Protein backbone atom coordinates (compact mmCIF):
# COMPACT_ATOMS: atom_id res chain seq x y z
CA UNK A 1 0.00 0.00 0.00
CA UNK A 2 1.36 3.42 -0.94
CA UNK A 3 1.33 6.53 1.20
CA UNK A 4 -2.20 7.90 1.64
CA UNK A 5 -4.17 10.19 3.93
CA UNK A 6 -5.36 7.32 6.13
CA UNK A 7 -1.80 6.15 6.81
CA UNK A 8 -0.63 9.71 7.38
CA UNK A 9 -3.46 10.35 9.83
CA UNK A 10 -2.60 7.19 11.73
CA UNK A 11 1.09 8.12 11.82
CA UNK A 12 0.33 11.67 12.97
CA UNK A 13 -2.07 10.44 15.64
CA UNK A 14 0.45 7.96 17.05
CA UNK A 15 3.29 10.48 16.96
CA UNK A 16 1.10 13.08 18.71
CA UNK A 17 0.42 10.64 21.55
CA UNK A 18 4.14 9.93 21.87
CA UNK A 19 5.02 13.63 22.00
CA UNK A 20 2.45 14.32 24.70
CA UNK A 21 4.12 11.70 26.86
CA UNK A 22 7.59 12.97 25.98
CA UNK A 23 7.18 16.70 26.66
CA UNK A 24 4.85 18.65 28.94
CA UNK A 25 4.37 21.30 26.25
CA UNK A 26 4.90 19.37 23.01
CA UNK A 27 5.56 21.16 19.74
CA UNK A 28 6.37 20.14 16.21
CA UNK A 29 7.48 21.72 12.94
CA UNK A 30 6.35 20.12 9.68
CA UNK A 31 7.86 20.39 6.20
CA UNK A 32 7.19 18.91 2.79
CA UNK A 33 8.86 18.54 -0.59
CA UNK A 34 7.54 18.67 -4.17
CA UNK A 35 6.20 15.13 -4.44
CA UNK A 36 2.57 14.40 -5.23
CA UNK A 37 0.39 15.10 -2.18
CA UNK A 38 3.31 16.03 0.09
CA UNK A 39 1.55 19.31 0.89
CA UNK A 40 -1.74 17.50 1.60
CA UNK A 41 -0.04 15.04 3.94
CA UNK A 42 1.77 17.89 5.72
CA UNK A 43 -1.47 19.80 6.34
CA UNK A 44 -3.18 16.62 7.58
CA UNK A 45 -0.31 16.19 10.03
CA UNK A 46 -0.58 19.79 11.22
CA UNK A 47 -4.34 19.51 11.75
CA UNK A 48 -4.09 16.28 13.73
CA UNK A 49 -1.20 17.59 15.83
CA UNK A 50 -3.13 20.77 16.62
CA UNK A 51 -6.25 18.73 17.38
CA UNK A 52 -4.24 16.62 19.84
CA UNK A 53 -2.94 19.69 21.67
CA UNK A 54 0.52 19.70 20.12
CA UNK A 55 1.69 23.16 19.06
CA UNK A 56 2.26 22.80 15.33
CA UNK A 57 4.24 24.91 12.86
CA UNK A 58 4.02 24.34 9.10
CA UNK A 59 6.80 25.50 6.79
CA UNK A 60 5.54 28.08 4.27
CA UNK A 61 6.01 26.05 1.05
CA UNK A 62 7.89 23.19 -0.59
CA UNK A 63 11.37 23.29 0.91
CA UNK A 64 14.47 21.09 1.33
CA UNK A 65 14.66 18.55 4.13
CA UNK A 66 17.67 20.37 5.68
CA UNK A 67 15.52 23.49 6.21
CA UNK A 68 13.07 21.38 8.22
CA UNK A 69 15.94 19.85 10.20
CA UNK A 70 17.24 23.35 10.94
CA UNK A 71 13.78 24.61 11.91
CA UNK A 72 13.60 22.05 14.74
CA UNK A 73 16.57 23.69 16.43
CA UNK A 74 15.58 27.22 15.40
CA UNK A 75 12.18 26.96 17.10
CA UNK A 76 13.38 24.47 19.75
CA UNK A 77 10.47 22.16 19.00
CA UNK A 78 9.94 18.75 20.53
CA UNK A 79 9.92 17.12 17.12
CA UNK A 80 9.86 17.55 13.37
CA UNK A 81 8.27 15.73 10.45
CA UNK A 82 9.35 15.95 6.82
CA UNK A 83 6.99 14.55 4.20
CA UNK A 84 9.38 13.23 1.55
CA UNK A 85 10.55 10.08 -0.17
CA UNK A 86 13.91 11.65 -1.01
CA UNK A 87 15.19 10.05 -4.26
CA UNK A 88 12.67 7.20 -4.48
CA UNK A 89 10.45 6.59 -7.55
CA UNK A 90 7.60 9.08 -8.28
CA UNK A 91 4.83 6.94 -6.81
CA UNK A 92 6.50 6.82 -3.38
CA UNK A 93 6.18 9.17 -0.45
CA UNK A 94 7.34 8.97 3.14
CA UNK A 95 7.37 10.37 6.64
CA UNK A 96 10.69 11.33 8.21
CA UNK A 97 10.53 11.92 11.97
CA UNK A 98 13.00 13.86 14.13
CA UNK A 99 13.20 14.47 17.88
CA UNK A 100 14.41 17.83 19.16
CA UNK A 101 15.37 19.32 22.53
CA UNK A 102 17.51 16.78 24.47
CA UNK A 103 17.74 14.57 21.36
CA UNK A 104 19.38 17.38 19.39
CA UNK A 105 17.08 17.41 16.38
CA UNK A 106 18.23 14.18 14.77
CA UNK A 107 16.19 11.37 13.26
CA UNK A 108 14.51 8.95 15.62
CA UNK A 109 16.34 5.80 16.69
CA UNK A 110 15.47 2.91 18.99
CA UNK A 111 13.64 2.79 21.37
CA UNK A 112 11.71 5.90 20.23
CA UNK A 113 10.97 4.41 16.79
CA UNK A 114 9.48 1.26 18.31
CA UNK A 115 7.48 3.22 20.89
CA UNK A 116 6.04 5.50 18.19
CA UNK A 117 5.25 2.53 15.93
CA UNK A 118 3.32 0.86 18.76
CA UNK A 119 1.23 4.00 19.27
CA UNK A 120 0.58 4.26 15.52
CA UNK A 121 -0.67 0.66 15.55
CA UNK A 122 -2.96 1.54 18.43
CA UNK A 123 -4.43 4.46 16.48
CA UNK A 124 -4.77 2.28 13.37
CA UNK A 125 -6.82 -0.23 15.34
CA UNK A 126 -9.43 2.45 16.00
CA UNK A 127 -11.39 4.81 13.76
CA UNK A 128 -9.37 7.70 12.35
CA UNK A 129 -12.60 9.71 12.08
CA UNK A 130 -12.40 9.93 15.88
CA UNK A 131 -9.07 11.77 15.72
CA UNK A 132 -9.70 15.42 16.58
CA UNK A 133 -8.49 17.96 14.01
CA UNK A 134 -7.89 21.68 14.28
CA UNK A 135 -6.72 24.46 11.99
CA UNK A 136 -5.14 26.16 14.99
CA UNK A 137 -1.60 25.70 13.71
CA UNK A 138 0.95 28.28 12.58
CA UNK A 139 1.91 28.64 8.92
CA UNK A 140 5.40 30.06 9.12
CA UNK A 141 6.78 32.94 7.09
CA UNK A 142 10.24 33.04 5.52
CA UNK A 143 12.05 33.96 8.74
CA UNK A 144 13.37 30.43 9.33
CA UNK A 145 14.26 29.99 5.64
CA UNK A 146 16.21 33.25 5.66
CA UNK A 147 17.96 32.21 8.88
CA UNK A 148 18.97 28.90 7.32
CA UNK A 149 20.29 30.71 4.23
CA UNK A 150 22.32 33.18 6.31
CA UNK A 151 23.82 30.44 8.48
CA UNK A 152 24.64 28.25 5.49
CA UNK A 153 26.17 31.11 3.50
CA UNK A 154 28.61 31.73 6.36
CA UNK A 155 30.26 28.39 5.58
CA UNK A 156 31.93 30.07 2.57
CA UNK A 157 35.07 31.78 3.82
CA UNK A 158 35.39 34.26 0.95
CA UNK A 159 33.38 35.33 -2.11
CA UNK A 160 34.39 34.05 -5.54
CA UNK A 161 33.46 34.83 -9.13
CA UNK A 162 35.36 32.53 -11.48
CA UNK A 163 33.76 29.11 -10.96
CA UNK A 164 32.10 27.66 -14.07
CA UNK A 165 29.79 24.81 -13.09
CA UNK A 166 26.41 23.19 -13.70
CA UNK A 167 23.65 22.43 -11.18
CA UNK A 168 20.61 20.19 -11.31
CA UNK A 169 17.88 19.94 -8.69
CA UNK A 170 16.68 16.61 -10.14
CA UNK A 171 13.10 17.98 -10.33
CA UNK A 172 13.30 18.71 -6.60
CA UNK A 173 13.16 21.61 -4.17
CA UNK A 174 16.84 22.51 -3.87
CA UNK A 175 17.38 25.30 -6.39
CA UNK A 176 15.57 28.23 -4.78
CA UNK A 177 17.33 27.87 -1.43
CA UNK A 178 20.71 27.07 -2.99
CA UNK A 179 20.52 30.05 -5.35
CA UNK A 180 19.71 32.46 -2.51
CA UNK A 181 22.48 30.96 -0.38
CA UNK A 182 25.00 31.39 -3.19
CA UNK A 183 24.01 35.03 -3.57
CA UNK A 184 24.34 35.60 0.17
CA UNK A 185 27.75 33.93 0.22
CA UNK A 186 29.08 35.85 -2.79
CA UNK A 187 29.52 32.66 -4.79
CA UNK A 188 28.71 32.49 -8.52
CA UNK A 189 25.40 31.13 -9.77
CA UNK A 190 25.55 27.91 -11.78
CA UNK A 191 24.38 27.05 -15.23
CA UNK A 192 21.20 25.14 -14.48
CA UNK A 193 19.56 22.17 -16.15
CA UNK A 194 16.40 24.05 -17.07
CA UNK A 195 14.24 20.94 -17.48
CA UNK A 196 15.09 19.76 -13.96
CA UNK A 197 15.46 22.93 -11.92
CA UNK A 198 11.91 23.34 -10.53
CA UNK A 199 9.87 20.87 -8.47
CA UNK A 200 7.93 18.28 -10.46
CA UNK A 201 6.77 15.20 -8.58
CA UNK A 202 6.43 13.19 -11.78
CA UNK A 203 10.21 13.44 -12.44
CA UNK A 204 9.64 13.39 -16.22
CA UNK A 205 13.25 13.40 -17.44
CA UNK A 206 14.72 10.60 -15.29
CA UNK A 207 13.87 6.96 -14.65
CA UNK A 208 14.76 7.40 -10.98
CA UNK A 209 15.41 10.84 -9.42
CA UNK A 210 18.56 9.55 -7.77
CA UNK A 211 21.85 11.18 -8.82
CA UNK A 212 23.60 7.86 -8.14
CA UNK A 213 21.55 6.08 -10.82
CA UNK A 214 23.09 5.54 -14.24
CA UNK A 215 21.79 8.15 -16.67
CA UNK A 216 20.41 10.49 -14.01
CA UNK A 217 23.00 13.15 -14.82
CA UNK A 218 22.80 12.84 -18.61
CA UNK A 219 21.06 16.20 -19.08
CA UNK A 220 23.49 17.87 -16.68
CA UNK A 221 26.43 16.45 -18.61
CA UNK A 222 24.94 17.76 -21.85
CA UNK A 223 24.74 21.28 -20.38
CA UNK A 224 28.23 20.95 -18.89
CA UNK A 225 29.68 20.13 -22.30
CA UNK A 226 27.85 23.07 -23.89
CA UNK A 227 29.14 25.45 -21.22
CA UNK A 228 32.61 23.89 -20.95
CA UNK A 229 31.96 23.55 -17.21
CA UNK A 230 34.56 22.47 -14.69
CA UNK A 231 32.20 20.20 -12.77
CA UNK A 232 28.56 19.37 -12.02
CA UNK A 233 26.82 19.41 -8.67
CA UNK A 234 23.42 17.81 -8.14
CA UNK A 235 20.96 17.58 -5.28
CA UNK A 236 18.45 14.79 -4.94
CA UNK A 237 14.76 15.87 -4.89
CA UNK A 238 14.65 16.86 -1.20
CA UNK A 239 18.19 18.31 -1.35
CA UNK A 240 19.65 16.40 1.56
CA UNK A 241 22.28 14.73 -0.63
CA UNK A 242 24.95 16.05 -3.01
CA UNK A 243 26.45 14.45 -6.10
CA UNK A 244 29.53 15.72 -7.94
CA UNK A 245 30.64 14.85 -11.48
CA UNK A 246 33.88 15.86 -13.21
CA UNK A 247 35.46 15.34 -16.65
CA UNK A 248 38.54 13.15 -16.93
CA UNK A 249 41.62 14.01 -19.00
CA UNK A 250 39.86 12.74 -22.15
CA UNK A 251 36.75 14.84 -21.49
CA UNK A 252 34.60 11.90 -20.39
CA UNK A 253 32.34 12.78 -17.49
CA UNK A 254 32.13 10.59 -14.40
CA UNK A 255 30.46 10.90 -11.02
CA UNK A 256 32.73 11.01 -7.99
CA UNK A 257 32.07 8.26 -5.48
CA UNK A 258 30.46 9.46 -2.26
CA UNK A 259 33.56 8.31 -0.39
CA UNK A 260 35.72 10.59 -2.54
CA UNK A 261 33.53 13.65 -1.98
CA UNK A 262 33.24 12.80 1.72
CA UNK A 263 37.00 12.59 2.14
CA UNK A 264 37.55 15.77 0.10
CA UNK A 265 35.15 17.68 2.35
CA UNK A 266 36.43 16.00 5.51
CA UNK A 267 40.05 16.90 4.72
CA UNK A 268 39.15 20.49 3.84
CA UNK A 269 37.22 20.97 7.08
CA UNK A 270 39.77 19.10 9.21
CA UNK A 271 42.42 21.62 8.21
CA UNK A 272 40.09 24.46 9.22
CA UNK A 273 39.28 22.83 12.57
CA UNK A 274 42.93 22.07 13.39
CA UNK A 275 43.55 22.69 17.09
CA UNK A 276 39.97 22.00 18.12
CA UNK A 277 38.71 18.87 19.81
CA UNK A 278 36.02 16.81 18.15
CA UNK A 279 35.11 13.81 16.05
CA UNK A 280 35.01 12.97 12.36
CA UNK A 281 32.40 10.27 11.77
CA UNK A 282 31.12 8.12 8.96
CA UNK A 283 28.95 5.07 8.60
CA UNK A 284 30.56 1.67 8.96
CA UNK A 285 30.28 1.03 5.21
CA UNK A 286 31.98 4.30 4.24
CA UNK A 287 35.67 4.84 3.49
CA UNK A 288 38.26 4.05 6.18
CA UNK A 289 40.23 7.00 4.80
CA UNK A 290 38.29 9.39 7.05
CA UNK A 291 39.88 7.76 10.10
CA UNK A 292 43.32 8.52 8.60
CA UNK A 293 42.34 12.17 8.17
CA UNK A 294 41.18 12.30 11.79
CA UNK A 295 44.42 10.71 12.96
CA UNK A 296 46.59 13.23 11.11
CA UNK A 297 44.81 16.21 12.65
CA UNK A 298 44.44 14.68 16.13
CA UNK A 299 40.66 14.30 16.03
CA UNK A 300 38.65 11.37 17.26
CA UNK A 301 37.11 9.16 14.59
CA UNK A 302 33.99 7.04 14.83
CA UNK A 303 32.20 4.55 12.62
CA UNK A 304 28.45 4.23 13.13
CA UNK A 305 25.71 2.00 11.86
CA UNK A 306 24.39 2.99 8.44
CA UNK A 307 22.28 6.15 8.38
CA UNK A 308 22.46 9.72 9.56
CA UNK A 309 20.17 8.93 12.47
CA UNK A 310 23.32 7.41 13.99
CA UNK A 311 25.94 9.80 12.61
CA UNK A 312 23.97 12.80 13.89
CA UNK A 313 24.16 11.49 17.45
CA UNK A 314 27.96 11.29 17.61
CA UNK A 315 29.29 13.35 20.51
CA UNK A 316 31.53 16.29 19.59
CA UNK A 317 30.78 15.85 15.90
CA UNK A 318 32.68 18.16 13.54
CA UNK A 319 31.93 16.41 10.25
CA UNK A 320 30.10 13.29 9.18
CA UNK A 321 29.36 11.50 5.93
CA UNK A 322 28.10 8.28 4.39
CA UNK A 323 29.07 6.84 1.04
CA UNK A 324 25.53 7.24 -0.34
CA UNK A 325 26.16 10.97 -1.03
CA UNK A 326 25.21 12.24 2.43
CA UNK A 327 27.34 14.90 4.17
CA UNK A 328 26.95 16.77 7.45
CA UNK A 329 29.27 19.77 7.33
CA UNK A 330 27.66 22.01 9.97
CA UNK A 331 26.48 19.94 12.97
CA UNK A 332 25.65 23.04 15.02
CA UNK A 333 22.95 23.89 12.48
CA UNK A 334 21.41 20.53 11.61
CA UNK A 335 21.90 16.95 12.76
CA UNK A 336 21.14 15.35 9.43
CA UNK A 337 22.72 15.20 6.00
CA UNK A 338 22.46 18.50 4.15
CA UNK A 339 23.02 18.77 0.40
CA UNK A 340 22.76 22.57 0.33
CA UNK A 341 25.42 23.14 2.99
CA UNK A 342 27.64 20.47 1.43
CA UNK A 343 27.38 22.28 -1.93
CA UNK A 344 28.50 25.56 -0.33
CA UNK A 345 31.51 23.93 1.35
CA UNK A 346 32.41 22.12 -1.87
CA UNK A 347 32.29 25.39 -3.82
CA UNK A 348 34.38 27.04 -1.11
CA UNK A 349 36.92 24.25 -1.51
CA UNK A 350 37.04 24.91 -5.26
CA UNK A 351 37.42 28.64 -4.59
CA UNK A 352 40.31 27.94 -2.24
CA UNK A 353 42.01 25.72 -4.80
CA UNK A 354 41.63 28.32 -7.55
CA UNK A 355 43.18 30.92 -5.27
CA UNK A 356 46.26 28.66 -5.16
CA UNK A 357 46.16 28.00 -8.91
CA UNK A 358 45.04 24.41 -8.36
CA UNK A 359 42.26 22.16 -9.64
CA UNK A 360 40.20 19.33 -8.17
CA UNK A 361 42.56 16.92 -9.93
CA UNK A 362 45.49 18.53 -8.09
CA UNK A 363 43.57 18.16 -4.83
CA UNK A 364 43.01 14.46 -5.54
CA UNK A 365 46.73 13.99 -6.20
CA UNK A 366 47.61 15.76 -2.95
CA UNK A 367 45.16 13.58 -1.05
CA UNK A 368 46.79 10.44 -2.46
CA UNK A 369 50.27 11.66 -1.49
CA UNK A 370 49.08 12.50 2.02
CA UNK A 371 46.87 9.51 2.82
CA UNK A 372 47.31 6.92 0.07
CA UNK A 373 45.09 5.82 -2.80
CA UNK A 374 41.69 4.60 -1.63
CA UNK A 375 39.00 3.20 -3.92
CA UNK A 376 35.58 1.75 -3.23
CA UNK A 377 33.22 -0.60 -5.02
CA UNK A 378 29.93 -2.35 -4.43
CA UNK A 379 28.31 -5.63 -5.41
CA UNK A 380 24.55 -5.96 -5.01
CA UNK A 381 22.75 -9.29 -5.16
CA UNK A 382 19.03 -8.91 -5.70
CA UNK A 383 16.76 -11.76 -4.60
CA UNK A 384 13.24 -12.79 -5.56
CA UNK A 385 12.64 -14.51 -2.22
CA UNK A 386 13.52 -12.54 0.92
CA UNK A 387 14.46 -15.75 2.73
CA UNK A 388 17.49 -15.96 0.41
CA UNK A 389 19.00 -12.95 2.18
CA UNK A 390 18.99 -14.71 5.54
CA UNK A 391 20.34 -17.91 4.03
CA UNK A 392 23.29 -16.16 2.36
CA UNK A 393 24.14 -14.10 5.46
CA UNK A 394 23.99 -17.27 7.57
CA UNK A 395 26.27 -19.12 5.14
CA UNK A 396 28.82 -16.30 5.23
CA UNK A 397 28.53 -16.12 9.02
CA UNK A 398 28.98 -19.85 9.59
CA UNK A 399 31.55 -20.43 6.87
CA UNK A 400 33.51 -17.18 6.41
CA UNK A 401 36.16 -17.24 3.68
CA UNK A 402 39.75 -17.46 4.93
CA UNK A 403 41.04 -15.47 1.97
CA UNK A 404 39.70 -13.31 -0.84
CA UNK A 405 41.52 -12.95 -4.18
CA UNK A 406 44.55 -14.65 -2.65
CA UNK A 407 44.73 -12.22 0.28
CA UNK A 408 44.24 -13.58 3.79
CA UNK A 409 41.34 -12.37 5.92
CA UNK A 410 43.10 -10.95 8.97
CA UNK A 411 39.94 -10.29 10.97
CA UNK A 412 36.31 -11.38 10.72
CA UNK A 413 33.69 -9.41 12.68
CA UNK A 414 30.08 -10.50 13.08
CA UNK A 415 28.21 -7.47 14.39
CA UNK A 416 25.30 -9.61 15.56
CA UNK A 417 27.71 -10.59 18.36
CA UNK A 418 28.99 -7.07 19.13
CA UNK A 419 27.28 -4.24 20.97
CA UNK A 420 26.04 -2.99 17.60
CA UNK A 421 23.77 -6.08 17.42
CA UNK A 422 23.32 -5.56 13.70
CA UNK A 423 23.28 -7.96 10.75
CA UNK A 424 26.61 -6.81 9.34
CA UNK A 425 29.66 -8.92 8.52
CA UNK A 426 33.13 -7.35 8.19
CA UNK A 427 36.17 -9.01 6.59
CA UNK A 428 39.42 -7.06 7.10
CA UNK A 429 42.21 -8.21 4.77
CA UNK A 430 45.94 -8.32 5.40
CA UNK A 431 46.60 -5.82 2.60
CA UNK A 432 44.36 -3.16 4.15
CA UNK A 433 41.32 -4.06 2.07
CA UNK A 434 37.89 -4.51 3.58
CA UNK A 435 34.68 -6.30 2.63
CA UNK A 436 31.39 -5.57 4.39
CA UNK A 437 28.18 -7.53 3.79
CA UNK A 438 24.76 -6.38 4.94
CA UNK A 439 21.13 -6.70 3.84
CA UNK A 440 19.69 -3.58 2.22
CA UNK A 441 17.31 -1.70 4.46
CA UNK A 442 15.04 -0.64 1.59
CA UNK A 443 15.33 -3.21 -1.21
CA UNK A 444 15.31 -7.03 -1.56
CA UNK A 445 19.06 -7.44 -1.89
CA UNK A 446 22.34 -7.90 -0.07
CA UNK A 447 25.01 -5.25 -0.50
CA UNK A 448 28.73 -5.97 -0.45
CA UNK A 449 30.94 -2.92 0.13
CA UNK A 450 34.55 -3.20 -1.08
CA UNK A 451 37.35 -0.87 0.00
CA UNK A 452 40.87 -1.21 -1.34
CA UNK A 453 44.17 0.65 -1.14
CA UNK A 454 47.07 0.95 -3.55
CA UNK A 455 50.36 2.74 -4.12
CA UNK A 456 48.64 5.10 -6.55
CA UNK A 457 45.17 5.39 -8.11
CA UNK A 458 46.00 3.02 -10.98
CA UNK A 459 47.34 0.41 -8.58
CA UNK A 460 44.32 0.84 -6.30
CA UNK A 461 41.97 0.30 -9.26
CA UNK A 462 43.84 -2.91 -10.10
CA UNK A 463 43.59 -4.15 -6.51
CA UNK A 464 39.87 -3.33 -6.42
CA UNK A 465 39.20 -5.17 -9.70
CA UNK A 466 40.95 -8.29 -8.35
CA UNK A 467 39.09 -7.89 -5.05
CA UNK A 468 35.74 -7.61 -6.85
CA UNK A 469 36.35 -10.75 -8.91
CA UNK A 470 37.57 -12.57 -5.79
CA UNK A 471 34.35 -11.78 -3.93
CA UNK A 472 32.23 -12.90 -6.89
CA UNK A 473 34.25 -16.11 -7.18
CA UNK A 474 33.55 -16.92 -3.52
CA UNK A 475 29.84 -16.18 -3.82
CA UNK A 476 29.58 -18.57 -6.80
CA UNK A 477 30.81 -21.48 -4.68
CA UNK A 478 28.31 -24.13 -3.62
CA UNK A 479 28.46 -23.01 0.02
CA UNK A 480 26.96 -19.66 -0.96
CA UNK A 481 25.11 -20.59 -4.14
CA UNK A 482 25.09 -17.30 -6.07
CA UNK A 483 26.10 -18.58 -9.50
CA UNK A 484 24.74 -15.52 -11.29
CA UNK A 485 26.71 -12.84 -9.43
Curated annotation (Swiss-Prot):
Give the matching Gene3D superfamilies: Alpha-D-Glucose-1,6-Bisphosphate, subunit A, domain 3, Alpha-D-phosphohexomutase, C-terminal domain
Key word Isomerase present: yes
- Binding, Mg(2+): 86, 236, 238, 240
- This chain belongs to which protein, by name? Probable phosphomannomutase
Q: Which CDD domains match?
A: PGM2 (cd05799)
Keywords recorded for this protein, A-Z: Isomerase, Magnesium, Metal-binding, Phosphoprotein
Task: Tell me one GO biological process term.
Answer: purine ribonucleoside salvage
Organism phylogeny: Bacteria, Pseudomonadati, Pseudomonadota, Gammaproteobacteria, Pasteurellales
Q: Which organism is it from?
A: Haemophilus influenzae (strain ATCC 51907 / DSM 11121 / KW20 / Rd)
**InterPro entries in UniProt:** A-D-PHexomutase_a/b/a-I (IPR005844), A-D-PHexomutase_a/b/a-I/II/III (IPR016055), A-D-PHexomutase_a/b/a-II (IPR005845), A-D-PHexomutase_a/b/a-III (IPR005846), A-D-PHexomutase_C (IPR005843), A-D-PHexomutase_C_sf (IPR036900), A-D-PHexomutase_CS (IPR016066), Alpha-D-phosphohexomutase_SF (IPR005841)
Q: Does the keyword Metal-binding belong to this entry?
A: yes
Active site residues of this protein:
86 (phosphoserine intermediate)
Judged by the first EC level, this protein's enzyme class is: isomerase
Amino acid sequence: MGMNRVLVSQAAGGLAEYLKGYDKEPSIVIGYDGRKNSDVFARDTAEIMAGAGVKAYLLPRKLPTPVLAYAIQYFDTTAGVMVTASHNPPEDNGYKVYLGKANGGGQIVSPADKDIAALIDKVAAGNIQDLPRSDNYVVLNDEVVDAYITKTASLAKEPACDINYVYTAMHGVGYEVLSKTLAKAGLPQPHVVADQVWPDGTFPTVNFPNPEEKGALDLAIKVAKEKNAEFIIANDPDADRLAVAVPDAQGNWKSLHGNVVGCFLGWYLAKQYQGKQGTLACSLVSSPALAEIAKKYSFQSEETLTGFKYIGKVSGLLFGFEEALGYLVDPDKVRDKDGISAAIVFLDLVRNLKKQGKTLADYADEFTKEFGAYVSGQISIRVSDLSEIGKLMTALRNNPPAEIAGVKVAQFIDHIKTDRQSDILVFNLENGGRLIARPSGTEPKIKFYLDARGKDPKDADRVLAEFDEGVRHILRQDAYGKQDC
